[in-house]
Amino acid sequence: MKDKIIGYCYVVGDILHKGHREHLRNCKAMCDILFCGVLSEKAVLEKKPKPILPYHERFDAVRPYADVVVCQDEYSPLSNCKAIKPDVLFESTSHKEQLANNYMKSIGKRIIALPYYGEQSSSMIKEKIRGKQNESTK
């Protein structure tokens, strides 16, 4: 039996949209077992505003797209990569987490940067909602 390729990706997963789904499907297509880290609220707040959806809802929304869903309690996936030791770390071209990338290279593993889906983002959706709310209060 051949060794299975283990992949690791991570998302905030707030307002799961087409870009998230495509990213997760692409990650899954390139490995046999996909671990997906869902960032805890604490992790998100290291670099972004507080998510609209609570952690448990974001966790559940990601479940259909990964074999194993785990909590990522830091913005960097480094701790989870050290614990899981995936063969592949999936990143987005919109950002690359240097510490985790350096670690993966140091243990002879791969980093694959998948294209950012620029047509839609959680931030764009939130801005649209805010705009509509502002219009309705005028």
Where are these predicted regions, by residue range?
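Nucleotidyltransferase catalytic core that binds NTPs
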Residues: 1-138
